[in-house]
Amino acid sequence: MNRDPLRDVVDAPLFIVPRVLERLRALRPALDGAALAEFERLRRCLLEGIERHPTRFWVLRQVQKAVEAVAGEDAESRQHLNTALKELLAIIGTDDGGVIP
């Protein structure tokens, strides 16, 4: 069984201001197929929930779900998604905590 990377994550509050939400709405990485669908699902989830759950752990749990959802895709698609996820986390103001391979 794989070790859960969130096990060692130190939770912290995130300061979500309108500018962060605007940048999340505007983020449109060059993805396709399952990677694009999963990125869009994650982006919607964050936009709908991050103000109620403004914590690093909650965000990383959502990102982890996206990473796991595309685990069966080809390496190039996964790499492009991982790059987009890191950009998304930079907008939010946190790192990946080891969730993104």
Briefly describe each language-model feature range.
Residues 1-48:
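Short terminal alpha-helical segments
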Residues 3-4, 74-101:
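Amphipathic alpha-helical binding modules
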Residues 19, 71-72:
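A very general structural signal that marks isolated residues within well-ordered alpha-helical segments
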Residues 29, 72-75:
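Long, contiguous binding/interaction regions
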Residues 32, 54, 93-97:
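Residue-level signal for secondary-structure boundary elements
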Residues 34, 38, 55-62, 77-84:
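Residue-level detector of well-ordered alpha-helical segments, enriched
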Residues 39, 43-70:
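Mature extracytoplasmic domains of secretory-pathway proteins
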